[in-house]
Design a protein with these regions (language model features):
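Short leucine-rich amphipathic alpha-helices used at interfaces
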Residues: 2-3, 45, 86, 114
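Short beta-strand/loop segment at the start of cytosolic alpha/beta domains
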Residues: 1-15
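Amphipathic alpha-helical interaction surfaces in cytosolic regulatory modules
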Residues: 22-100
Length: 122
């Protein structure tokens, strides 16, 4: 799993590539805090671009939940976007699509967080 970053408007986009499983989850968790710091400092929401994530295991799902929990300690917001069909199916079966904000495209996610990066109602 590798991580590619960019900024678009009020969104820090983190693109995950490859697989998020037991072997890569620790690296993802270790890589996340500096991005959470930057997002909090710059008042950005984090959009996880999953368009190039091929697979997510139960350990990877746990990683997503921990990321959301960490973001809340920063008063931040994490949303996911552009899920591949297999990853989308895993999200649906595990009901993660009910727990996390899921967008069909990165552009839609960026538009959704544009007015409220931390998720508060305006």
């Amino acid at each position: 799993m590798s991580l590619v970053t960019s900024v678009n408007g009020n969104a820090l986009i983190l693109g995950l590539k490859g697989r998020l499983d037991q072997d890569s989850c620790d690296a993802f968790r270790d890589d996340l805090p500096p991005h959470l710091d930057a997002a909090a400092r710059d008042h950005l929401a984090i959009v996880l671009d999953l368009s190039q994530l091929e697979y997510v295991s139960s350990a990877g799902l746990r990683c997503f939940m921990l990321a959301v929990k960490q973001a809340k300690t920063y008063n931040g917001r994490i949303v996911v976007a552009a899920l591949q069909p297999m990853v989308a199916e895993i999200f649906q079966i595990s009901r993660f699509d009910m727990l996390l904000e899921v967008f069909t495209t990165v552009a839609k996610a960026v538009a959704a967080v544009a007015s409220s990066p931390s998720g508060e109602k305006t």
